[in-house]
């Protein structure tokens, strides 16, 4: 290595450097290096740890996601109970005065005594968590549970980028950081968009999505849900000099690199608390996360001890929630918004109504099925709620106030073409969501289309990440994937966090991507329901892009594993002239791949057989095993089903193994796979009951 002959020293340096960049990016929101440079550092650390496994440490950034799913969540007893905070029943300013009066009476303070000093914080709508650090390293994360006993969720919490795996600076022997795991609203919306895109159930609100992620048995599921964290207190600690005030404690936690909310304020007496409450009420709609109130705490720790607890609630703290947020108004019309995945979402246009401190004029109606289920019609009086305490939602109509029989809203009849780009709008038979078919062309879908196109398994354009794509699209430098191949050094070098060197690296990566394969190119187009495996099947079957473009639904269904739904998605994609125009622009930009005659029927020792790979194989990576199977005519799927012929199981095989056993799928290990590929016959030591010993 250029700077360190000692791999251990270099690994330690990389871990510290990556941790600093993570803290700057995820906690401070002030990125310090380009994405491509961060990726380079991360890969270098991965390479060192792969070559020297003995250097792997639990606080390494490479270890945030990993390991097999757990069989169950293990109970954890809290050394210091995680108690709940009393909720003030009076949501008005009088509720604040009631709390202050109780505190003063408990402390024996009279009218002539000084005002009590308080710290005001936000009441986050998330999941309470306890993070235990020993000598600075995160060793356990546990849910609140019943306050006495929670559940060990360390495997999932390690995937949260905001939570440091190692504390900054000189850390105490033991410190348990208490706080809230939550999901930002924009992350929640993006997650639900992905759920809709995959045909999966959407989440009701960010809190449910966050809580469900934290309690998953498989950390890979949690890693796919973008979670955040704020600290607000302390549990057990040893070797830690406890500050004199709650405010100082939060400052100390922030110095350890733990995220602490900036919206907090020290004040004296009830009037300061009331002012904070009202100021946050006016601000809450602009916050990037959900809150359902504020929390007041006596600031001095010695007074907290003196006040103590009553019925397992601290006397020195109270939650002050905001009032209920439902009102009635008239539905003036229904508009449509096009999301980044092409989903058309109906939006209620409302007569202005004041709900929970803000004036609401629009609210989500989700999709056609929800409109039908709620029977909401233009002209109705409707109940409006700020769902999740933030996002306005139409709950339903007030039927007794309906006049006559207003017509029902039909999205496809009202919007046969995309309101953004004019492409055809389509909706699958069993799908709730209608979509714009102009995926490569539609401005609303540009960012998502570009990120998918540049992905590692698509065109593999290294360095083209979220932030850069956002800049390129917002500055109107790139409108379609074809525009990437027109980029020059001047246009890139002027972008934020993109110097001349980074620009040259990106241009080199774009140039390298011109030489690809037909399968990668098809996958990069982002055709709905066309994954990597289907793209390979299409490339193999048709042999050329022109043959694919000319295929109708009937011809497409001749491709192995392409059924009516996928065939319809492909046909609709290429029936949209805007998409074909971008495809031709990409060809004109010099993208190249080998083409040939349509493939003959698959041959080889496992031709026509479907495999699923799970667990860690002794000598083969999953990609290597997949390539071997495909080279012998087989196909690799990502999930076990009745159509699966063989499950290739390695160490720490997860839920796929159990499902394969339930379905009676043949199970082989790596040796069994090699024998199968060589002879086409299953080894007699492998069977449907499990992996051979």
UniProtKB/Swiss-Prot annotation:
Its EC number is 6.5.1.2. GO terms for biological process: DNA repair; DNA replication. It catalyses: NAD(+) + (deoxyribonucleotide)n-3'-hydroxyl + 5'-phospho-(deoxyribonucleotide)m = (deoxyribonucleotide)n+m + AMP + beta-nicotinamide D-nucleotide. InterPro entries: BRCT_dom (IPR001357), BRCT_dom_sf (IPR036420), DisA/LigA_HHH (IPR041663), DNA_ligase (IPR001679), DNA_ligase_AS (IPR018239), DNA_ligase_CS (IPR033136), DNAligase_adenylation (IPR013839), DNAligase_N (IPR013840). Residues 601-690 form the BRCT domain. One of its GO terms (molecular function) is DNA binding. Keywords: DNA damage, DNA repair, DNA replication, Ligase, Magnesium, Manganese, Metal-binding, NAD, Zinc. NAD(+) binds at residues 35-39, 84-85, 121, 144, 180, 297, 321. DNA ligase that catalyzes the formation of phosphodiester linkages between 5'-phosphoryl and 3'-hydroxyl groups in double-stranded DNA using NAD as a coenzyme and as the energy source for the reaction. It is essential for DNA replication and repair of damaged DNA. PANTHER family: CHROMOSOME TRANSMISSION FIDELITY FACTOR 18, REPLICATION FACTOR C SUBUNIT 1. This is DNA ligase. It comes from Azoarcus sp. (strain BH72).
């Amino acid at each position: 290595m250029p700077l360190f002959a000692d791999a251990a020293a270099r690994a330690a340096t990389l871990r510290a450097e990556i941790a600093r960049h993570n803290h700057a990016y995820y906690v401070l929101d002030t990125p310090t290096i380009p994405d491509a440079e961060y990726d380079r550092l991360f890969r270098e650390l991965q390479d060192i740890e792969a070559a020297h496994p003995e250097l792997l440490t639990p606080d390494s950034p490479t270890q945030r996601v990993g390991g097999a799913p757990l069989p169950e969540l293990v109970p954890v007893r809290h050394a210091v109970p995680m108690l709940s905070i009393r909720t003030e029943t009076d949501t008005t300013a009088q509720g604040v005065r009631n709390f202050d009066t109780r505190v003063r009476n408990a402390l024996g303070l009279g009218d002539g005594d000084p005002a009590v000093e308080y710290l005001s914080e936000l009441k986050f709508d998330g999941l309470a968590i306890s993070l235990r650090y020993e000598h600075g390293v995160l060793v356990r994360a546990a849910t609140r549970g019943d306050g006495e006993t929670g559940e060990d969720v360390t495997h999932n919490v390690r995937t949260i980028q905001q939570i440091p795996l190692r504390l900054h600076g000189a850390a105490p022997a033991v410190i348990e950081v208490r706080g809230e795991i939550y999901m930002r609203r924009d992350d929640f919306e993006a997650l639900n968009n992905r759920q809709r895109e995959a045909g999966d159930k959407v989440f009701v609100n960010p809190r449910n999505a966050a809580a469900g992620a934290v309690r998953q048995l498989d950390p890979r599921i949690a890693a796919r849900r973008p979670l955040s964290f704020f600290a607000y207190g302390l549990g057990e600690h040893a070797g830690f000099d406890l500050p004199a005030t709650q405010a100082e404690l939060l400052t100390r936690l922030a110095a350890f690199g733990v995220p602490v909310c900036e919206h907090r304020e020290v004040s004296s007496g009830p009037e300061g608390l009331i002012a904070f409450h009202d100021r946050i009420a006016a601000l809450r709609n602009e916050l990037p996360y959900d809150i359902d109130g504020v929390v007041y705490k006596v600031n001095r720790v010695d007074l907290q001890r003196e006040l103590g607890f009553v019925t397992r609630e601290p006397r020195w703290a109270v939650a002050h929630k905001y009032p209920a947020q439902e009102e009635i108004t008239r539905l003036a019309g229904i508009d449509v918004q096009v999301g980044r995945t092409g989903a058309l979402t109906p939006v209620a246009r409302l007569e202005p109504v004041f709900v929970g401190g803000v004036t609401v004029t629009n609210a989500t109606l989700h999709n056609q099925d929800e409109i039908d289920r709620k029977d909401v019609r233009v002209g109705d009086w409707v109940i409006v709620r700020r769902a999740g305490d933030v996002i306005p939602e139409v709950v339903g109509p007030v039927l007794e106030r309906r006049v006559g029989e207003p017509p029902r809203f039909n999205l496809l009849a009202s919007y046969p073409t995309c309101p953004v780009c004019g492409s055809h709008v389509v909706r699958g038979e069993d799908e709730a969501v209608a979509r714009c078919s102009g995926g490569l062309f539609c401005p609303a879908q540009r960012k998502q289309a570009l990120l998918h196109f540049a992905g590692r398994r698509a065109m593999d354009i290294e360095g083209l990440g979220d932030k850069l794509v956002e800049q390129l699209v917002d500055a109107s430098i790139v409108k379609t994937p074809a525009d990437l191949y027109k980029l020059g050094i001047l246009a890139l070098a002027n972008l934020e966090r993109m110097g001349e060197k980074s620009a040259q690296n990106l241009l080199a990566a774009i140039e390298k991507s011109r030489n690809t394969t037909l399968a990668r190119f098809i996958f990069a187009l982002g055709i709905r329901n066309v994954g990597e495996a289907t793209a390979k099947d299409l490339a193999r079957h048709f042999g050329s892009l022109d043959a694919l473009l000319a295929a109708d639904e009937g011809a497409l269904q001749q491709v192995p594993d392409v059924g009516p739904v996928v065939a319809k998605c492909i046909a609709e994609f290429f029936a949209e002239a805007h998409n074909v125009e971008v495809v031709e622009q990409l060809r004109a930009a010099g993208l190249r791949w080998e083409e040939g005659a349509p493939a003959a029927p698959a041959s080889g020792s496992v031709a026509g057989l479907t495999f699923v790979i799970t667990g860690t194989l002794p000598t083969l990576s999953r990609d290597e095993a997949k390539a071997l199977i495909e080279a012998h005519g087989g196909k690799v799927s990502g999930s076990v089903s009745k159509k699966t012929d063989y499950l290739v199981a390695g160490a720490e095989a997860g839920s796929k193994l159990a499902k394969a056993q339930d379905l009676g799928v043949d199970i082989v290990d790596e040796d069994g796979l090699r024998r199968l590929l060589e002879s086409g016959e299953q080894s007699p030591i492998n069977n449907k009951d499990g992996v051979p010993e």
